[in-house]
């Protein structure tokens, strides 16, 4: 028997695919007048919220205006329980290809994002995945292995990024941020002390108020009124009692990350997680990123394949929409990207409409505005797919080219392939 109710899984998948497959047009415009998928040559060509980018992976030969910001769902439909919304989350949010190197050290690790935490938050990211380690007598953000941070896998002290989060919450008093920690911190009270020193304890959502049996979370309105606007989860169960940091898989289900999480037609649960259709946890984290991050492919991944996977995971979750969508290189797409998909995930749940932009504040559930979908055709050529380059500018300035960052990750793949031999020799 299908887990879908009234064909919701099929309807969501089909609407996502139709919208994303229809994104394609090229026209002459400039001076901030260019709309989504119009041809562009610089950041100033596109209207606010769009940037100028291309996607050779789908055969696009020229840059077009590409969506670069999420629509806040609470700005349209407010006052529902926190677990009714879907939020954008960045995988390894700290692993920024443009992050400064440590003095005298060449970093050897994978990169998953291309801009700062502050930029991510300003562009609508509301969930951050952070890997925290004991390093240099402090707690650092590292993209490492075997539970140990090295100088060539280290990025920066964790408090630096947490202070960016504090500044954002302070300046945006109605916003809620979630942090998920891959936790390799062993010092006593390390996490609780770290967050207090960053000034984030005043926003802390207490574990005692988190639903443990699959009930609804408090409404976003109540969370804002009580200033419980920071949710923090750890991968270490003992820290819930020791430090008051919630154990992640006690409160959410999660699909498998890496390549198993992007395999078409399959959405298995992560081994630490309960089954995705479990009723004992009211949050659902959907991972969608390959094991090895490849920048030039991200724009293609964030189109029809992701839209289809949302439908697959919706069905695996017992007709429950994911609450967090975690991706690499969140800005890269062939048009609407993860931002359009988020709208398509929020719309049916929040207001019964195909997309968030069709929702009408204060109207009855299912009362939707007519939304015009662009159906345009971009400039294409037969050789564009072989081009590994890319140009990106706009609300987020990428200071490295796509090709140079891809080369870094390819070098890391080679280095990590030699690691077992090096460990054996040592």
From Swiss-Prot:
Lipid-modified sites (GPI-anchor amidated serine): 404
Domain PI-PLC X-box intervals: 76-232
Domain of life: Eukaryota
Keywords, in A-Z order: Cell membrane, Glycoprotein, GPI-anchor, Lipoprotein, Membrane, Signal
Alphabetized Gene3D superfamilies for the sequence: Phosphatidylinositol (PI) phosphodiesterase
Entries under PROSITE patterns matching the protein: PIPLC_X_DOMAIN (PS50007)
Entries under SUPFAM superfamilies matching the protein: PLC-like phosphodiesterases
Keyword Glycoprotein included in the entry's annotation: yes
UniProt keyword Glycoprotein present: yes
Primary location: membrane
Compartments reported by the entry: Cell membrane
Gene Ontology biological process terms from the UniProt entry: lipid metabolic process
Membrane protein topology class: Lipid-anchor; GPI-anchor
Entry protein name: PI-PLC X domain-containing protein At5g67130
């Amino acid at each position: 028997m299908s887990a879908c109710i009234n064909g919701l899984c099929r309807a969501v998948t089909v609407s996502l695919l139709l919208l994303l497959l229809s994104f394609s047009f090229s026209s002459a415009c400039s001076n901030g007048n260019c709309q989504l998928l119009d041809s562009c040559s610089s950041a100033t060509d596109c209207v606010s919220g769009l940037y100028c980018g291309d996607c050779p992976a789908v055969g696009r030969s020229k840059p077009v205006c590409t969506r670069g910001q999420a629509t806040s769902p609470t700005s349209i439909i407010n006052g529902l329980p926190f677990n009714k919304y879907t939020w954008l989350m960045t995988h390894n949010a700290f692993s920024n290809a443009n992050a400064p190197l440590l003095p005298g050290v060449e970093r050897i690790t994978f990169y998953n994002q291309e801009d700062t935490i502050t930029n991510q938050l300003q562009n609508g990211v509301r969930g951050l995945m952070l890997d925290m380690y004991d390093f240099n007598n402090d707690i650092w953000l590292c993209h490492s292995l075997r539970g140990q941070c090295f100088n060539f896998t280290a990025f920066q002290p964790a408090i630096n990024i947490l202070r960016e989060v504090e500044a954002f919450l302070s300046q945006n008093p109605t916003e809620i941020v979630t942090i998920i920690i891959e936790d390799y911190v062993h010092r006593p009270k390390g996490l609780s002390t770290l967050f207090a020193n960053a000034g984030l304890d005043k926003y802390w959502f207490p574990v005692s108020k988190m639903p443990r049996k699959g009930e609804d979370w408090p409404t976003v309105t109540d969370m804002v009124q009580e200033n419980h606007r920071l949710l923090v989860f750890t991968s270490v169960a003992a820290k819930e009692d020791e430090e008051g940091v919630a154990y992640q898989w006690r409160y959410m289900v999660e699909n498998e990350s890496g390549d198993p999480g992007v395999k078409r037609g399959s959405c298995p649960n992560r081994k630490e997680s309960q089954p995705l259709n479990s009723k004992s946890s009211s949050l659902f984290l959907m991972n969608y990123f390959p094991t090895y991050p490849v920048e030039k492919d991200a724009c293609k991944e964030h189109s029809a394949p992701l839209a289809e996977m949302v439908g697959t995971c919706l069905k695996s979750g017992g007709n429950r929409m994911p609450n967090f969508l975690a991706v690499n290189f969140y800005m890269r797409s062939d048009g609407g990207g993860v931002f359009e998909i988020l709208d398509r995930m929020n719309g049916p749940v929040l207001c019964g409409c195909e997309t968030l932009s069709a929702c009408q504040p204060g109207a009855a559930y299912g009362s939707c505005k007519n939304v015009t979908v662009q159906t345009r055709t971009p400039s294409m050529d037969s050789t564009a797919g072989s081009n590994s380059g890319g140009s990106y500018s706009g609300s987020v300035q990428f200071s490295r080219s796509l090709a140079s960052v891809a080369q870094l990750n390819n070098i890391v793949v080679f280095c990590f392939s030699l690691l077992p031999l090096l460990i054996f020799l040592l």
